Amino acid sequence: MGFAVESRSHVKDILGLINTFNEVKKITVDGTTPITVAHVAALARRHDVKVALEAEQCRARVETCSSWVQRKAEDGADIYGVTTGFGACSSRRTNQLSELQESLIRCLLAGVFTKGCASSVDELPATATRSAMLLRLNSFTYGCSGIRWEVMEALEKLLNSNVSPKVPLRGSVSASGDLIPLAYIAGLLIGKPSVVARIGDDVEVPAPEALSRVGLRPFKLQAKEGLALVNGTSFATALASTVMYDANVLLLLVETLCGMFCEVIFGREEFAHPLIHKVKPHPGQIESAELLEWLLRSSPFQDLSREYYSIDKLKKPKQDRYALRSSPQWLAPLVQTIRDATTTVETEVNSANDNPIIDHANDRALHGANFQGSAVGFYMDYVRIAVAGLGKLLFAQFTELMIEYYSNGLPGNLSLGPDLSVDYGLKGLDIAMAAYSSELQYLANPVTTHVHSAEQHNQDINSLALISARKTEEALDILKLMIASHLTAMCQAVDLRQLEEALVKVVENVVSTLADECGLPNDTKARLLYVAKAVPVYTYLESPCDPTLPLLLGLEQSCFGSILALHKKDGIETDTLVDRLAEFEKRLSDRLENEMTAVRVLYEKKGHKTADNNDALVRIQGSRFLPFYRFVREELDTGVMSARREQTPQEDVQKVFDAIADGRITVPLLHCLQGFLGQPNGCANGVESFQSVWNKSA
């Protein structure tokens, strides 16, 4: 088989986006330097990022185009939007060049702010408006829109002064461009008093005052300039850009957390073996499997998992359930969709997307439809479906964590106890996750299938790209809630796994010590130790010596087996063994509960900080997911959840959600993946890399 592995491409691309977002200080706008979704997101969310309009690269072509339009307009040339009416009214003619442009802006300032209605959101976020201003500016640099250089410089100054107009949330069909939202940017430039501008995060003033504060005067629009300002896909593409930045980061986050889920659920890492994916070579599947194989390589939790199953091979099914085992196959189309959507949106970012396109070199205006945002609209629908797929995967994994039958020894609801009759752990999150998942699946329904003819049947097909981008942004917010809940639960599971290991050692030590003190035969001691290791600790933690719970039942059964075994041997008295076993059980009741309670209470108070002198409590220290655990527990100051703790699940999940929403989560993500891109074909400790095994399986 000669398939080629497309190695680490989407991981590399996403890490590149994150680094660009974090490091960019200046965005060059010249029509030749590509602008990525990370650049757009950085400008939207970081006030320290500036825009640099490079005159040397593009001013000449911009001014040549503008001069051509003015000359043709004054000569009475028949050019759409210059000497004609707009849209379905393009059969009208006029020589009132400036008045025509002013009239266009006036009629398009038709959005409505719905303050006082049920929804508290009635305007597009300032982040989207700033991004749209950047993309409109970039579109003009191609020199085929007919706008003056001075207008472009004004946009640059407004952006660098953090001034932008307030824009109503609704009203765009995204063909012919985002007319109504973009009219508010034009309204700011011409100083319309009805347009309100934001200065920074807090100040709101009328457009004329905003211009005055940054040393600008209202523009009197010349031929085509009003049309150039409004007739493009800039708002839809701007919002789609920040959406795609987030979608990429969340995709990589979900992929990575699949590995953490495998650790805490005691899954088998076999699902990521290279040969499985070599014979079904979807690029996204191969890349996801390679990432997960690397994350789980030499995992200390995998060592613990193998030890767990070696005791009793019938403890769980031979194969893990689909939420883990088929995760690379499930992720494959989601990876590809988000990758393709990113490319499509970035193509739109770096385009001239208005009409007509001025071909001044050939002395003509080309009437087309680059304002049609269907590429963005359709891909926003596709991305929303992909986001729903990510959410469904998280929901399935979360459900496995909550159910003791599926979680391989973890307590139901991830409850620490000790009294499970009054400790319901993360049950509330379990319910919330179902609600999140249901709403997310609903949002996966397409927007672009709901097109209506607009503007006197001139815009008889339109993209609805901005609406679709808004809904995708909404879907991503829900996915962030699901990731926050899932990560919180997995940190709880890590604590429970580490505590489980520590408690099993306590039980083994107590059983071994008492067996020696009571003079039990070696074979009897071995039987008892097998039970101590084999019985899941959380099935009896509530009351270790309760005769109705699995530990004591198992020990008693083992003792009975020892008595029977001795009885079958001639010449050996069983009475002495019975007496010794009775003494063993009495001492066990006195000692075991106290020692287990001491360990549990200490861990409940200090969590992983109790790890100084206990190997069992440092299992996470050797995991690649330590950065996530440490970030959640230390940086965000959360703790293991128990009935004794006053903290509610909401308080901890809120901290994690906020860190995802504001981007801080990328810090542990980058630390977690540090070294992945630079892995050689061979690996230390005799473990081969994914690529090495791939090459050998030809």
Curated annotation (Swiss-Prot):
Its main location: cytoplasm. GO terms for molecular function: intramolecular aminotransferase activity; phenylalanine ammonia-lyase activity. It is found in: Cytoplasm. Pathway: Alkaloid biosynthesis; taxol biosynthesis; Phenylpropanoid metabolism; trans-cinnamate biosynthesis; trans-cinnamate from L-phenylalanine: step 1/1. Its EC number is 5.4.3.10, 4.3.1.24. Contains an active site 4-methylidene-imidazol-5-one (MIO), which is formed autocatalytically by cyclization and dehydration of residues Ala-Ser-Gly. PROSITE patterns: PAL_HISTIDASE. The modification 2,3-didehydroalanine (Ser) is found at residue 176. GO terms for cellular component: cytoplasm. (E)-cinnamate binds at residues 231, 319, 325, 355, 427, 455, 458. Belongs to the PAL/histidase family. Phenylalanine aminomutase that catalyzes the rearrangement of L-phenylalanine to R-beta-phenylalanine. Catalyzes the first committed step in the biosynthesis of the side chain of the alkaloid taxol (paclitaxel), a widely-used compound with antitumor activity. Also has low phenylalanine ammonia-lyase activity. This is Phenylalanine aminomutase (L-beta-phenylalanine forming).
